[in-house]
Curated annotation (Swiss-Prot):
Name the record gives this protein: S-adenosylmethionine decarboxylase proenzyme
Family of the protein in this entry: Belongs to the prokaryotic AdoMetDC family. Type 1 subfamily.
UniProt cofactor(s): pyruvate
Catalyzed reactions per annotation: S-adenosyl-L-methionine + H(+) = S-adenosyl 3-(methylsulfanyl)propylamine + CO2
Organism: Pyrococcus furiosus (strain ATCC 43587 / DSM 3638 / JCM 8422 / Vc1)
Highest taxon in the source lineage: Archaea
A GO-annotated cellular component: cytosol
Subunit comment: Heterotetramer of two alpha and two beta chains arranged as a dimer of alpha/beta heterodimers.
Gene3D superfamilies documented for this protein: 3.30.160.750, S-adenosylmethionine decarboxylase domain
InterPro entries linked to this entry: AdoMetDC_C, AdoMetDC_fam_prok, AdoMetDC_N, S-AdoMet_deCO2ase_core, S-AdoMet_deCOase_pro-enz
Any one GO BP annotation for this protein: spermidine biosynthetic process
Entry keyword annotation includes S-adenosyl-L-methionine: yes
Amino acid sequence: MDTIGYHYVVEAAGCDPEVIADPNKIREIFLEAAKVGNMEVKASYFFKFSPMGVSGVVIVAESHISVHTWPEKGYAALDVYTCGEKADPEKAVDYILEKFKAKYAHVSELKRGIEEEDSTFTHTILTWEEKLDRRNGNK
């Protein structure tokens, strides 16, 4: 079966706590990430927890971008899932990590789509730590 979509599951650490504690800032980042990744925004919702933390989602025609943050730990759990040919989820992920000022990230890329007659499917694990280290001036 052809791939239906690409799902990036991202562990982002060393993020700027002020950025990932602000639902309005995250919404702004996600809306721009959708544009950078050539996605069509349909809706968005973000919720700020007390005393801290944000969960949110941007629904795009191609699927979604979502987040759960722990500012006290500098940590964000991100999902970027797209289907179709025109979207570039990797660009969206890279943009979000840059704006979150993530120092470390583990990115798992899952090729989505399996039919009943398919007996196996594979997932590829990617790590972008080296790229983040270079961007943060550590190499």
